[in-house]
């Protein structure tokens, strides 16, 4: 039931944005009663924050599995991690948290956990090829590119990536 609520919350964030997401709609999409939803998540903030954290954990696990399977890592890992509908669900949360004190308070600890997970995962994936600062720069650059991609079409986005990735890779990796 918890997983259904988390998935429904992400679906709502993607489809309706944070302001259009309601706990009633999440419960409806999850196929659970409002009481069951409240038992697991007493507030909208707690539910959407848990949903985004769940997404981050899933995505990091996928990246670590790919690394364990021998897939070579490049800075494209950051672009892939911070793009698409799932990233935009998290972005909805950040934007709403800017002006919503309760959500802001809920998102701050999440951001700390996400940053720790990214740093830990980046160290595993890149080893000595990237310093912690290079990982941080890469995260910030990938997030910025993902936001600006909202205003580019797929073709221009791919062209931009093709031009920037080799330069970015050379700047942040040690070999």
Predicted regions: what is each one?
Residues 104-108, 124-175:
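Hydrophobic/aromatic-rich alpha-helical bundle segments in the mid-to-C-terminal region
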Residues 81-105, 111:
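Amphipathic alpha-helical segments used for helix-helix packing
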Residues 44, 51, 55-59, 86, ...:
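Hydrophobic/aromatic residues within well-ordered alpha-helical segments
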Residues 1, 5-8, 86, 134:
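N-terminal positioning helix adjacent to the helix-turn-helix/winged-helix DNA-binding module
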Residues 8-15, 62, 89, 93, ...:
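Solvent-exposed, amphipathic alpha-helical segments
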Residues 4, 8-46, 50:
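Helix-turn-helix
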Residues 46, 50, 60-88, 134-138, ...:
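Hydrophobic alpha-helical connector segments
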Residues 42-46, 50, 98, 102, ...:
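Residues in soluble alpha-helical coiled-coils and helical-bundle/repeat scaffolds
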């Amino acid at each position: 039931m918890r997983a259904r609520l988390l998935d429904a919350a992400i679906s709502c964030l993607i489809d309706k944005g944070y302001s259009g997401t309601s706990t009633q709609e999440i419960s409806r999409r999850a196929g659970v009663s409002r009481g069951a939803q409240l038992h697991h998540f007493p507030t909208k903030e707690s539910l959407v924050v848990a949903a985004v954290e769940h997404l981050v954990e899933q995505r990091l696990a996928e990246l670590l599995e790919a690394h364990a399977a021998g897939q070579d890592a490049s800075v494209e890992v950051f672009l892939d991690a911070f793009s698409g509908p799932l990233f935009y669900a998290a972005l909805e949360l950040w934007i709403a948290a800017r002006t919503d004190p309760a959500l802001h308070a809920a998102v701050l600890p999440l951001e700390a956990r996400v940053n720790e997970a990214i740093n830990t995962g980046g160290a595993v994936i890149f080893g000595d090829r990237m310093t912690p600062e290079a990982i941080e720069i890469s995260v910030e650059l990938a997030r910025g590119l993902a936001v600006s991609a909202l205003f580019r079409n797929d073709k221009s986005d791919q062209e931009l990536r093709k031009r920037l990735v080799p330069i970015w890779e050379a700047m942040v990796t040690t070999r």
